[in-house]
Swiss-Prot record:
Protein localization: Endoplasmic reticulum membrane
Source organism: Drosophila erecta (Fruit fly)
Family: Belongs to the EMP24/GP25L family.
GO BP terms: dorsal/ventral pattern formation
UniProt KW keywords: Coiled coil, Developmental protein, Endoplasmic reticulum, Membrane, Signal, Transmembrane, Transmembrane helix
PROSITE patterns: GOLD (PS50866)
Signal peptide: 1-20
Protein name: Transmembrane emp24 domain-containing protein eca
Taxonomic lineage: Eukaryota, Metazoa, Ecdysozoa, Arthropoda, Hexapoda
Task performed by this protein: Eca and bai are essential, though not redundant, for dorsoventral patterning of the embryo. Specifically required during early embryogenesis for the activity of maternal tkv, while the zygotic tkv is not affected. Involved in Golgi organization.
Domain GOLD: 30-126
């Protein structure tokens, strides 16, 4: 019982954690990130673009002419979202298939900003972390206890989705392993048949050679 409680606590701590980072890109550069998402899970992407200022040797808030083209593809390589956003914003989408979702970003800057160095701040929130509970409490007029219960219910739901996703991955891995083992078996059988045929042909050829030389 204690081990189960510890495992549940660890899962709650690591489940769908937020990912905050920043990276540098040029005008034509494209950056992609892979996020493993269960099905029917909300993902929120917060971003902010800054433009390098050579006079101050630092990054400043970008001008309105610079935005970001954001493209999201699911595990079936289908486009979930693809559009141009402003230099700072919040993007939200819901996964409909479990698996790796690829989030790609690149600048839509014009020739005026060609070659400019950009810094992009990125924060990806998955699952319960994508829910603004303060806003939920205000809209639904929840008490502190009701809000806490709501959070726990959402956590349990996310754990269930994560467990289903892990079972999906295990099933897919098992199917891949069985397919690989089957191919290895058939390849081994094919090699055995080829070797037997070659041995039979060599024996026939050797027998014909001995008969031609009247050695047998």
């Amino acid at each position: 019982m204690r081990d189960q409680f510890i495992s549940l606590a660890l899962m709650l701590c690591i489940l769908h954690s937020a990912c905050g980072l920043y990276f540098h890109i040029s005008e034509t550069e494209r950056k992609c990130f892979i996020e493993e998402v269960p099905d029917e899970t909300t993902v929120i992407v917060n971003y902010k673009v800054e433009l390098y200022d050579p006079r101050s040797n630092g990054f400043m808030p970008s001008s309105p002419g610079i935005g970001m083209h954001v493209e999201v593809r699911d595990s079936d390589d289908k486009i979930v979202l693809s559009r141009v956003y402003s230099s700072q914003g919040r993007i939200s989408f819901t996964s409909h298939t479990p698996g790796e979702h690829v989030i790609c970003m690149y600048s839509n800057s014009t020739a005026w900003f060609s070659g400019a160095q950009l810094r992009v701040h990125l924060d990806i929130q998955v699952g319960e972390h994508a829910i603004d509970y303060a806003n939920v409490a205000q809209k639904e007029k929840l008490t502190e206890l009701q809000l806490r219960i709501r959070q726990l219910l959402d956590q349990v739901e996310q754990i269930t989705k994560e467990q289903n996703y892990q079972r999906y991955r295990e099933e897919r891995f098992r199917h891949t392993s069985e397919s690989t083992n089957s191919r290895v078996l058939w390849w081994s059988l094919a090699q055995t048949v080829v070797l037997v045929c070659m041995g039979f042909w060599q024996m026939r050829h050797l027998k014909s050679f001995f008969e031609a030389k009247k050695l047998v």
